[in-house]
Amino acid sequence: MINEIKNDAKDRMAKSVESLKTQMSKIRTGRAHPSLLDGIQVEYYGAATPLKQLANVVAEDARTLSISIFDRSMIQAVEKAILTSDLGLNPSSNGQTLRVPLPPLTEERRRDLTKIVRAEAEGARVAVRNIRRDANADLKALLKDKEISEDDDRRAQEEIQKLTDSFIKLVDEALALKEKELMEI
């Protein structure tokens, strides 16, 4: 029973950290990365469709993305979707593919993005702590129902705290890495 609570907490904490990393990958740094365009939806035959289902996106070099669209008639729609996104990108078409040059980030924009990244990391820390709180509440319920002893409860809470500390450390490492990426020119 205690192991189920610990495993559940561990799985949920891992999902929180994974979610943070996914969110951070969508925040633009100075480098071109195909995942930058993952959030873009294109109007395709009346339905909003993710860009990655309509095209192949690759990093041509450190500052340029190349988009090979499977259906050539969709080039204008994809171009419009990128232009209207909040990424501030300006694609150019050569009839076959779209090239998306990434403008260098200004110092002010870097600071803004750093604030956003820190807020995301804090949200992940809060989520991890909430999971710890839920696990400890489950343990208290077991203790109250006399299904576990006080020693087992204390030991399990210490293990959950160690889990929490390790996942918060992962969040801090992800934050430090992203801040370093953002501050590189």
Swiss-Prot record:
Pfam families: RRF
One GO-annotated biological process of the protein: cytoplasmic translational termination
Keywords: Cytoplasm, Protein biosynthesis
GO cellular component terms, semicolon-separated: cytosol
Regions annotated as coiled coil: none
Keyword Transferase: no
Annotated family: Belongs to the RRF family.
Summary of the function given for this chain in its UniProt record: Responsible for the release of ribosomes from messenger RNA at the termination of protein biosynthesis. May increase the efficiency of translation by recycling ribosomes from one round of translation to another.
PANTHER family recorded: MITOCHONDRIAL RIBOSOME RECYCLING FACTOR PSEUDO 1, RIBOSOME RECYCLING FACTOR
Protein name stated in the entry: Ribosome-recycling factor
Organism phylogeny: Bacteria, Pseudomonadati, Pseudomonadota, Gammaproteobacteria, Aeromonadales
Gene: frr
